[in-house]
């Protein structure tokens, strides 16, 4: 699907939210800092998916449903079609957790249930390509070392789409992050966590899993650096990629800087 208008600088980025407790967190603030208008589309509240012609970028959040749960959540199929259209139009796309699985599925990769739950504070290890990546690579975001602190909450996992670049792994789940093209990223893990999201998550986490303030602060600090780089690369056209608002009656929320 080709872009009908090559200049989308004034069009809002759509954040597709699937459940109340998995909002954009730091993603929305970083976009606002760059002057990017954001529309949060609450699919769990019955909001309609936007047209590809109306968005300047796409962020797809997590949720407890799975890629294959289309009987219970019929919008999942439409969301994948929108993701594919955004990739084909060379728009910036960020998929987080379920969103990464949806991105992988939209690009033809298999999504399956894994052997174990991966839940709670942790880290991912960057691959050789991940260490050189303009978003995740320490040379670009100022991080030290080759690991990225994050929060995990998943069991489903994805195969890598064809022609994608593998960026990060854990021992339990080697496919933690990938890039397709220069501006489409899938992150199985969460770096958007801030104090508000952590507060919403704590009572929902499995017994024995804690999310202490120190872990949240580390993830928020690192996450903002990673997200800053993602937005910078997206807005620059990714030339170097070779190495809250109020709800309206549709269920969408408009956030503007």
List where the protein language model places each region:
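Pocket-forming structural segment of enzyme catalytic cores
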Residues: 107-195
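A glycine-centered loop/beta-turn motif at secondary-structure junctions
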Residues: 163, 174-218, 229, 233
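Catalytic nucleophile loop
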Residues: 86-110
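Active-site metal-binding loops of divalent metal-dependent hydrolases
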Residues: 63-64, 100, 191
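N-terminal beta1-alpha1 cap of cysteine-dependent amidohydrolase-like domains
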Residues: 1-89, 125, 205-257
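Short glycine-/acidic-enriched loop or helix-start segments at secondary-structure transitions
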Residues: 24-26, 50, 69-71, 103-106, ...
């Amino acid at each position: 699907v080709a872009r009908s208008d090559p200049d989308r600088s004034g069009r809002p980025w759509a954040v597709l939210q699937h459940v109340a407790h998995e909002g954009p967190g730091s993603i929305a603030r970083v976009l606002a800092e760059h002057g990017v208008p954001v529309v949060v589309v609450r699919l769990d509240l019955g909001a309609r998916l936007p047209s590809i012609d109306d968005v300047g970028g796409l962020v797809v959040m997590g949720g407890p449903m799975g890629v294959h749960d289309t009987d219970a959540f019929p919008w999942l199929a439409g969301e994948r079609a929108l993701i594919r259209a955004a990739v084909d139009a060379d728009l910036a796309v960020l998929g987080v957790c379920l969103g990464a699985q949806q991105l992988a599925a939209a690009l033809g990769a298999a999504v399956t249930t894994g052997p174990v739950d991966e839940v709670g504070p942790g880290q991912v290890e960057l691959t050789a390509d991940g260490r050189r990546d303009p978003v995740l690579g320490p040379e670009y975001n100022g991080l030290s070392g080759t690991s990225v602190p994050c929060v995990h909450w998943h069991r489903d996992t994805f195969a890598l789409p064809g022609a994608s670049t593998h960026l990060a792994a854990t021992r339990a789940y080697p496919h933690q992050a990938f890039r397709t093209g220069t501006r489409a990223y899938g992150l199985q893990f969460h770096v958007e966590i801030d104090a508000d999201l952590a507060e919403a998550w704590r009572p929902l986490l499995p017994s024995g899993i804690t999310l202490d303030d120190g872990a949240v602060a580390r993830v928020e600090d690192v996450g903002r650096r990673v997200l800053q780089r993602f937005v910078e690369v997206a807005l620059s056209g990714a030339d170097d990629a070779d190495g809250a608002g109020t709800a309206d009656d549709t269920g969408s929320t408009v956030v503007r800087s």
